Amino acid sequence: MGYAGGTKKNPTYYSLGNHTETIQIDYDPARISYAQLLDIFWKSHQPDRKSWSRQYMAAVFYHTDEQKQRALQTRDREAKRLQTKIQTEIIPVTPFYLAEAYHQKYYLRQVPELVKEYAARYPELNAFIGSTAVSRVNGYIGGHGSLESLQKEIAGLGLSPAGSRRLTEIVQALDKNSRYAAQGGAYCPVPF
């Protein structure tokens, strides 16, 4: 989690300037394509909803003309599918500034016993936020995954038996009410 899209150097949550809260995705194009990431992105938010502030606006930040064109094509496809104007911005990337530590992995931070396990394994902030397992668990706690998908990968998430049980309890409760579960899973699939 961090800030991008603005001109202020070294923004913080309380001194954001004209930046937007966003994430930076580092990916291996041999495993998942930019087009696939865009498809996940469009399914994972409401692109026709106008944001009430620049801080929280939905945006695609592109690095190349090719990425820009692909983002515009998929935006137009979504506008046609939804039969409405798309409010999601498509803008050139600016420097990405990592947000403060307490903003990282927000959903996971709501479950102290799981944070404690991962903090012991990843004591450095960059290792903690860069961990695939930490990111996956944060997503599950945020309601972005089904109990079925968790059960398939829980052994590889690096949790103790107690941590695994706690995560399973959380996902069981969320799975019953999750809009993502009801839609068949508009969350990032496990890369194989």
Model regions: which residues?
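Flexible coil/turn and secondary-structure edge motifs
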Residues: M1-F192
